[in-house]
Amino acid sequence: EGQMEVASIVSKPVEGVNAGKIENIELVSRAIREAMSEAEEQLGIRITEAYAGISGDFVRCARHTDHVFVYDPQNGVNQKDVDALFDRMRNVQAPDDETIMERVPQNYVVDDNQEVKNPVGSFGKKLSSTFNFILCLRTPMQRLDMALKRLGIKMLGVTSNAIATAEAVLLPDEKEEGVAVVDIGGGVTDVAVYYRNVVRYIATIPMGAMAINRDIRTMSVPEKHVESLKQKYGSAVADLAPEDKLIRVNGRTAREAKDILLRNLATVIEARATDIAEFVLQEIRDSGYAGKLAYGIVLTGGSAKLKDVDELFRRVTGMDVRIASAETGVAEESREKVVDPAYATAVGILLKGAEQGACAVIERPASPASRSAEPRPGFQPRQPQDVPEFRHMPRFQQPAQGPASAAAQPASDEDAAARGQEREDEQLKAPVIEPKRKRDWGSIFQKTFDKINKSFTAAEDEEI
């Protein structure tokens, strides 16, 4: 039924990554090797190819509008006109330091005034469309490829984590009626906005769970206890935490044990979580679809498990919020394996890879083998360029011709030649997407601690 069975899922901590960017290839390769070796041992297979996901503030979207002249206006738009428009979009160039990962059509417009879902059969002289280009800086993508190549793994393709996550958690009605997917990861928070079944906007906020953990450490909590303290006793909404309940956190010795008021812990968590929610809201507004998201926000990622985080997002954004794990496209018998929202992105990457025809090629050795940096003898991995850039180019059905269209005369040879020349002239132009404008994130940390200090000061004033 087109659903995916998850055979194994392995998660390993990784160092050498900062806000999604690989800073130490050796450490990243080591973590990938450990995870893959464990999965191979569980399943008795050897993995030689991978489809990857990437995330960071170096991934962005940019819109570009272009048009073609309809080849035979008297008989209306046909599939060749749509294909010609897609060819035009193939010619759009990224800035020198970026590469285009995906091109997503947003709409079709005939003669600048009639927006249609299916342009084939519409009458007009010009067919236009706006495409959403998903771009990534070349350097982070090259480092990801290098980390995999060190293990003899061929990277068949790469997708935006924001889009992959959405594919795993969203329901059809949510995609159609409007929703924002918010994936709160360790180093970054990804946002993807969907409307009318199309991804309209993606963005990455360079902070996530690790920023919250760093704030908790300022309460003199040992690093090894931070995550468990946050998950077991933390809350993203301070006024929902107990006012007078204490929790003892052990230090290296009994003498260093520390009592922490849960309300204070929640105050620290809420300050940073509010920052994240406010920046998410700003990205949703920047998308231009804030007023069209009937289904509000879908939260996922490891930090979606934080107590009351959904309530915090409701208060900050004023939108409906639900917490989701990977269910879309996953076979029912596999859903228990991926019930943790932290696995949503990994499942989404698998779904995107299968959609692009980049399913991993595996073999079953007689006995589990250790990972080698060399592919098996005679193995010819699929090349990334073999995956079509427009795998889902729409193939619209030509409407049945009625009496009016049947009586229409085809364009003259002169008109057809003129249209052809116009298309050739257009093909010579290669538009370049504008470089990214950097957002200023510099004030967020001071802003967070100002909130914390204000809250603590107010509490002290009340005691006095």
Predicted segment positions?
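Glycine-rich phosphate-binding loops at beta-strand->alpha-helix junctions
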Residues: S55, C136, S235-V237, K292-V316
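Acidic, glycine-rich loop-and-beta core segments that form the ion-binding/anion-interacting portion
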Residues: A168-P242
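Nucleotide/phosphate-binding catalytic cleft detector across ATP-hydrolyzing
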Residues: G2-A50, I54-V179, P222-E223, S228, ...
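Phosphate/pyrophosphate-binding loops at sites that engage ATP/ADP/AMP, CoA/4′-phosphopantetheine
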Residues: A35-T48, A277-Y295
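Short beta-alpha connecting loops at secondary-structure transitions
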Residues: R200-Y201, M210, R214, L261-L265, ...
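Glycine-rich phosphate-binding/hydrolytic loop that grips phosphoryl groups
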Residues: A324-R376
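Short acidic loop-to-helix transition motifs that present clustered carboxylates
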Residues: S160-E167, A211, T328-A331
